[in-house]
Amino acid sequence: SECAKQDGTVSITPVNNGFLIKCGSLEYEVANNSSSIFRQLNDYRKVYTDKNFEGPYLKDKDGNTYKLKIGEWKVIEAGPVTASVEAECSNIAAGNIENKNIKAVIKVTGYAGKPWVNITYRIINTSDDELKIKSLVFYIKKSEDSVITEQLKPLKITAGNDSTGCGDIRTDNSHNDGPVFMTRGTTELDMLEKKADVNNIRTVVATSNYKTSFIIGKNGEEVNEVIDDKYLVKEANEHFAEVFYGTFMADYTDGEDGFSVTVHQAQQNYPKAVKSCREGVAVMLVPENVGEITMQSGMAKEQQFMIHFHSPDMKLWEIDNRSLIYQMPDRPYIAPEVFKRAGVMIDVFPVKYNDDFEISLMAKADGHSRCYGMLNWGDTVDQGYTVQGRGGGKPVWSNNEYDYPHACALMYARTGVRRFMDYLIVSAKHWMDIDVCHYSSNPLRIGGQWEHTAGHCKNGVMVCSHEWVEGLLDYYHFTGDKRGYDTAVGIGENVLKLLETPMYQVPGEANARETGWALRTLTALYIETNDNKWLVKCDWIIDNFKKWEEEYGDWLSPYTDNTAIRVGFMISIAVGSVMRYYRIFPREDIRQMILRAVDDLTE
């Protein structure tokens, strides 16, 4: 069904080999087998065509310039509050079509009664080689014949860094006639809106740490901003960056219409750049000659940005406000007692809270290492593994060992503290993109999770003891993003394949955590899907643990060529996994096996 402007609903209608989406304040079409995200967009002030939107366009450092080919759109969500459509895409290298075809997925989400859309772009290295990205840029042009380049004009004025950490450095533009102005905070915006008249084209870029720093151009003067490692290392940011660091946007406004683009968590996912000029806006998800982005074969990365269409008379502080809210949206809250009554999680809800214990848990969660960068955000370097030399002298990435997102989900459920959900979301998104193999000629890798290694997956291996799903399922439950569910199922399928390999055929030849983690993964997937296929190997693992105990007396692990020892850590993982299986299928023989294993540990 169709909806009228501003009636507070959304609709999606199949039309002309694509879809027409009406959101009340916007309506737009997407077309199958096209080269532009939008076939047409109407904000009821101006109609934009496919020629107003270009990219994202990919270039690599081997000299390839790629053409974007969008496949068939499919409906992900059809209202009443949001409308989402998604399409698989190909980035095809000109002149090298057969050998270079880099896949991508684009999703467009509109909102009831809102004049903005969210764009997610997920690139996947579906080649056998490293993909060294030279640039990845999206353009919105004011007119069909406008030309915007990715070149950045050197500015004599910059926003600078908020090194005080207070956001209180004052600016004075009362005697500045332009053509470029820099101001921090909203105090001077009314004055600068008069100096930079939208009827002569006003250009803006903005970043924030505490107060937002605006660079404003009049008469269509180019303004731009770049975020790189040098920018970040000089800026004092004391926020919980998973929740909020600051914003990063570009705005173009003339006498007819205006649009701003905000890149989500740009600082955390550097390098990034934006520019606004007389012809429109360039959004540089990877700017040229800024940093190094090398995606290994099978690696993916999703990024997102919001396009906000607004009237020429909308105040800059309102545009900034919407941009900031996009960076830190409201999160739902459910009281811990509701989680406890629902029984949807293991019982981590004490009757009486101990302040010292709670402070300790929160400190551990808040004190986790944060590693910035487009391919690093959401993961952390394991200094212990690195010092041991496991990365051959290079940093070893933990790859979310041992299901850090699940721990965050439990912390959110038991406390209701918002930032733990944001920790979950950021780390799970990294996990789904970087730590999982999306392309390989080896079927034992597809869908599986890489063990901690240098370069996230470079020279990596896959074993059952380093594949987890509970945090991904938590992410799916909290966000509704089915990619969490699909990724968890893919990991489960990989575990089933690995369990058929020789490494796992003889009880006791691998340590207890190997099949222990496999059992925990498969049990969680059975609970989620109610599909009996996950139970076949569960029963096999339980039987192996019984044979293991009978053969060795306890769950001993191979150590040296002539030694088998008790490794408490490994055994405890196995116990926890068998316990989870027992809770679903209680049997006295399993209960007694658990008790004997724990007795052996404590003795």
Walk through the language-model features, giving the residues of each.
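Beta-strand/loop-rich accessory regions of lumenal/periplasmic or secreted enzymes
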Residues: 14-332, 337, 376-380, 396-399, ...
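Low-complexity, Ser/Thr/Pro/Gly-enriched N-terminal "stalk/linker" regions
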Residues: 321-392, 436-444
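Carboxylate/His-rich catalytic cores and anion/metal-binding grooves
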Residues: 25-28, 63-69, 416-445
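Well-ordered alpha-helical segments within folded domains of soluble proteins
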Residues: 395-413, 461-476, 509-526, 563-582
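Long, well-ordered core segments of solenoidal/helical folds
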Residues: 333, 360-377, 423-439, 482-503, ...
